[in-house]
């Protein structure tokens, strides 16, 4: 027996309803998100991270469709670490030295104690060293560390209590003196004479550069290599010269995600990708362009000619690591306090 045919109008309505239901149940494309990260960094990385942030944001947008904005905070490395410990919600920190990041674990449990093992090269995607920036023509004839303690030489360096760069400066000088004179006591005497030639201690490396370059104070600036090369680029080689000392320290600025912050904010994936980007070919190229020494062999070879030849020693070789160096030299009552309170 044949069933009566349904009216055409009802068939169309049923078809429309089925289509609507199917569309309702179909998965919707993910909506693009706007993400903000805070990178708390040390003083002279401003130009570098401006380039990194632009390149990473473009890559992340192409890969995920999400818009990521990276905000920057810059200052003396020790001061920056204390700000994070006191509650500044950094998704990542890119500081001047490992001890300052260790403090985030030791004092606030913001990161695990083994944070430095999570990325290659002890979580340092680039390196640097300490050189001398002098006025054009080097009128005071400064060639090596022993020239810095001569009478009448004005030496500009920041305060090691607040600046990571200043601690690298201090240890570079100490390491040279210890090698030359053979004892800790003589090294301390040398550093005391050097500090006696320092007219002012700025809180960070960029402030010290401003004092030397813009205010015209002093005869020589103890500087991050990248900061000295940037000064030549921006201000012109007709105003300053770089002097590479015979021996200096290998500065290894490390990076990490701040676990408690990224887990609270839900930003771990993008924060980790941001740090991984520093190790990528593009990130390494940007490091070289901004006068940091890349750790990737091909990038290091590409930019090798822009860096002076310097014999380098490491913090582990000369001082037994950052924890020991900090306690001996920069903690309350350490050698810096012993020297500077007598100044």
Q: Residue ranges of each PLM-predicted region?
A:
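Twin-arginine (Tat) signal peptide motif
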Residues: 2-14, 25
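N-terminal segment of the mature folded domain
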Residues: 32-162, 337-342
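Short beta-strand->loop
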Residues: 40-42, 134-136, 154-180, 195-198, ...
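A bilobed periplasmic-binding-protein/Venus flytrap-type ligand-binding module shared by bacterial periplasmic
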Residues: 129-138, 252-269, 286-290
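Short helix-loop capping/hinge motifs at secondary-structure junctions, enriched
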Residues: 137-143, 162, 175-183, 261-269
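Ligand-binding pocket segment of bilobal, Venus flytrap-like solute-binding proteins
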Residues: 180-246
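Extracellular/periplasmic juxtamembrane helices and adjacent flexible linkers that interface
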Residues: 262-343
